[in-house]
Amino acid sequence: YAGNSYRHCLVVSGGVTGHDLTPPHDISDKSVYGRLPKGENGEFYADLMKRSFTLLNDHPVNLKRVKEGKKPANSIWLWGEGTKPALEDFSKMRGLKGGIITAVDLVKGIGMLAGMRILDVDGITGNYDTDFKGKAEAAADALLNDGLDYVYIHIDAPDECGHRGDCAHKVYSIEQIDGKVLKTLFKRFENAGEDFTLLVCPDHSTPCDIKTH
């Protein structure tokens, strides 16, 4: 199933869990040797990854990227094994209706399982080129005009920049959060005369010097 950016979804029907699958962003600038899938079906998954190179390396898209001086997407990398969690509907638990804004399908899926409304926003990418203000405006519209009690805005840009070791764009992303997300929300709610609570909570650090969590 096609997702966004480098995150896509492989569904293995009747598969087993317990594999050792290395997240690619944990081994930036490191060798992949010794980090291929391990476990009951590890050899099968590793073979899929190796065979994908044969299919993708000479693909017209990759030939064009190489010609343009870009890195080719010449293989798949399997990681992030999991099963569908059983989450309770938050609105039924607390009587509060919520929404979620994100470009990351994993986060979107968690919101759906928790009974949150998915708020689609044009121009969001999950990276530093996302529409920061568009996210804030969509959240404010949903809260002020569409009956929602809370909205979770997921912004992945600083994390992605950290994984790339891109300090300049990480700083830029944080500045955009401050200047275009928080500032927009404050203005919208204050102009509407509404009481509001804003919670800003990072879930982990991603230092540019180590490119991982």
Give the ranges of each region predicted by the language model:
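Feature captures the catalytic ectodomains and active-site-proximal regions of enzymes
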Residues: 1-213
